[in-house]
Amino acid sequence: MGLQISIRESGDVTILDLRGKSTIDGGESELLGGCLKELIANGVRKLLLNLADLTQVDTTGVGVIIGKYISLRDRGGELKLLCPCGRVLEVFRVLRLLQFISSFEDETQALASFRPKGYVARL
Protein backbone atom coordinates (compact mmCIF):
# COMPACT_ATOMS: atom_id res chain seq x y z
CA MET A 1 0.00 0.00 0.00
CA GLY A 2 1.27 3.49 -0.84
CA LEU A 3 0.95 6.45 1.48
CA GLN A 4 -2.48 7.75 2.49
CA ILE A 5 -2.72 11.09 4.28
CA SER A 6 -5.76 12.26 6.24
CA ILE A 7 -5.78 15.80 7.61
CA ARG A 8 -7.78 16.90 10.63
CA GLU A 9 -7.60 19.71 13.15
CA SER A 10 -7.79 19.99 16.90
CA GLY A 11 -7.90 23.64 17.89
CA ASP A 12 -4.92 25.30 16.23
CA VAL A 13 -3.04 22.02 15.72
CA THR A 14 -3.17 20.31 12.33
CA ILE A 15 -2.89 16.52 12.57
CA LEU A 16 -1.78 14.38 9.66
CA ASP A 17 -2.73 10.72 9.99
CA LEU A 18 -0.27 8.77 7.85
CA ARG A 19 -1.10 5.24 6.68
CA GLY A 20 1.08 2.93 4.59
CA LYS A 21 4.68 3.70 3.68
CA SER A 22 6.77 6.74 2.80
CA THR A 23 9.52 5.75 0.38
CA ILE A 24 11.20 7.29 -2.63
CA ASP A 25 10.44 4.48 -5.07
CA GLY A 26 6.68 4.88 -4.93
CA GLY A 27 6.73 8.68 -4.80
CA GLU A 28 5.15 8.69 -1.34
CA SER A 29 7.87 10.89 0.16
CA GLU A 30 7.21 13.46 -2.55
CA LEU A 31 3.49 13.31 -1.73
CA LEU A 32 4.20 13.86 1.97
CA GLY A 33 6.64 16.70 1.26
CA GLY A 34 4.16 18.44 -1.03
CA CYS A 35 1.35 18.14 1.49
CA LEU A 36 3.48 19.53 4.33
CA LYS A 37 4.86 22.33 2.14
CA GLU A 38 1.33 23.42 1.19
CA LEU A 39 0.13 23.40 4.80
CA ILE A 40 3.11 25.48 5.94
CA ALA A 41 2.67 27.91 3.02
CA ASN A 42 -0.98 28.32 4.08
CA GLY A 43 0.05 29.39 7.58
CA VAL A 44 -0.09 26.16 9.58
CA ARG A 45 2.42 26.47 12.43
CA LYS A 46 1.54 23.51 14.67
CA LEU A 47 1.79 20.09 13.04
CA LEU A 48 1.37 16.68 14.60
CA LEU A 49 2.30 13.68 12.46
CA ASN A 50 0.36 10.60 13.57
CA LEU A 51 2.61 7.69 12.60
CA ALA A 52 0.65 4.87 14.26
CA ASP A 53 -0.29 3.35 10.89
CA LEU A 54 2.90 4.23 9.00
CA THR A 55 4.54 0.88 8.29
CA GLN A 56 7.73 1.96 6.54
CA VAL A 57 9.87 5.06 6.04
CA ASP A 58 13.14 5.40 4.17
CA THR A 59 15.81 8.09 4.37
CA THR A 60 13.94 10.21 1.83
CA GLY A 61 10.84 10.21 4.04
CA VAL A 62 12.97 11.00 7.08
CA GLY A 63 14.59 13.83 5.12
CA VAL A 64 11.15 15.28 4.33
CA ILE A 65 10.19 15.21 8.01
CA ILE A 66 13.48 16.80 9.12
CA GLY A 67 13.25 19.46 6.42
CA LYS A 68 9.72 20.45 7.38
CA TYR A 69 10.62 20.37 11.09
CA ILE A 70 13.40 22.90 10.40
CA SER A 71 11.17 24.98 8.12
CA LEU A 72 8.47 25.22 10.79
CA ARG A 73 10.97 25.90 13.58
CA ASP A 74 12.46 28.77 11.57
CA ARG A 75 8.94 30.25 11.23
CA GLY A 76 8.24 29.96 14.96
CA GLY A 77 6.20 26.78 14.52
CA GLU A 78 6.45 23.22 15.76
CA LEU A 79 6.30 19.73 14.29
CA LYS A 80 5.85 16.78 16.64
CA LEU A 81 5.40 13.04 16.23
CA LEU A 82 2.65 10.78 17.53
CA CYS A 83 3.02 7.01 17.97
CA PRO A 84 6.03 6.08 15.87
CA CYS A 85 6.23 2.28 16.07
CA GLY A 86 7.74 -0.83 14.52
CA ARG A 87 10.24 -0.29 11.72
CA VAL A 88 9.52 3.44 11.63
CA LEU A 89 10.48 3.78 15.30
CA GLU A 90 13.64 1.74 14.68
CA VAL A 91 14.69 4.06 11.84
CA PHE A 92 14.02 7.15 13.96
CA ARG A 93 16.04 5.71 16.85
CA VAL A 94 19.00 4.72 14.67
CA LEU A 95 19.07 8.20 13.14
CA ARG A 96 18.57 9.79 16.59
CA LEU A 97 15.63 11.76 15.25
CA LEU A 98 13.75 11.51 18.55
CA GLN A 99 16.52 13.47 20.29
CA PHE A 100 15.37 16.70 18.68
CA ILE A 101 11.80 16.10 17.48
CA SER A 102 9.31 15.57 20.31
CA SER A 103 7.42 12.28 20.20
CA PHE A 104 4.34 11.20 22.12
CA GLU A 105 2.41 7.95 22.61
CA ASP A 106 -0.84 9.69 23.58
CA GLU A 107 -2.67 12.19 21.36
CA THR A 108 -4.08 14.17 24.28
CA GLN A 109 -0.59 14.69 25.72
CA ALA A 110 0.78 15.56 22.28
CA LEU A 111 -1.90 18.21 21.76
CA ALA A 112 -1.35 19.61 25.27
CA SER A 113 2.37 19.99 24.52
CA PHE A 114 1.56 22.66 21.91
CA ARG A 115 -0.07 24.89 24.55
CA PRO A 116 1.96 27.52 26.40
CA LYS A 117 3.28 26.51 29.81
CA GLY A 118 0.77 27.38 32.53
CA TYR A 119 -2.16 27.18 30.08
CA VAL A 120 -5.46 26.33 31.73
CA ALA A 121 -8.44 25.35 29.61
CA ARG A 122 -11.52 27.45 30.29
CA LEU A 123 -14.85 25.73 30.41
Which residues does each PLM region occupy?
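Amphipathic alpha-helical interaction surfaces in cytosolic regulatory modules
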Residues: 22-101
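Non-catalytic signal-transmission and effector/linker regions of two-component phosphorelay proteins
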Residues: 1-10, 115-123
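General small-molecule cofactor/ligand-binding pocket signal
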Residues: 6, 82, 104
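Short acidic-hydrophobic, aromatic-tinged amphipathic segments that line or gate anion-handling sites
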Residues: 102-106, 110
